Amino acid sequence: MMNDFLTEDTKAIILLCGVFGKDRSEKPLSLGEYSSLVRWLIKVKMRPGDLLQKDTIHEASMGSGINKQRLESLLGRGVQLGFAVEEWKRNGIWVISRSDIDYPVRYKKHLKNNAPPLLFGVGNRSLLKGDGLGIVGSRNVDQAGELFTRQVAEFCAYNRMPVVSGGARGVDQISMNATLEAGGVAIGILAENLLKKSVERSARQAIADGCLLLLSPYHPNARFTA
């Protein structure tokens, strides 16, 4: 069932970079460490999924400079990942990685090696491929700012332009709600609580109608700590 939900590449990337389960004995790879590993994979013409074969781990360790035991421990979390996948599926959460065809091209183009290795999402996945207008701003917006935000978001809805925002209180949430209320579509790029946000009453129907996509590079239960 896991193979129907994840590609082999994404499975390997989650094992290496993902936070799940109760075992914290080995720290998942940082973005920099994963990028170093990717450079080695490209050099030897291999893919992340190839690391699921134990006979490749020694070479990967030597080529990337990442401790072999750490790689083995992270890649050995298959049982824990299986439980996590079942929970994500129950809650309508899907996962894509930088190696997947659905991964946003703009992320790779503009962020390059800094593009998140993983993206967790809920909702209309096809919205990843379209255009959009970013609307972000203060959490404590005044009345004039709120009115302007609503006008711009409604204009986007009428012109079939998705609104892309952060989903936080204030301008972000106002813009997303306004475009949805006007019959448009919205994409929320979240820094925390993807799961919690996806089950809120205001989001559930829009997700079911295919009008809302919630996306996060962090674990679905992660909280914002900055």
Regions found by a protein language model. Name each.
Residues 1-24, 90-91, 98-226:
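Glycine-biased, small-residue-rich flexible motifs in mid-sequence functional cores and linkers
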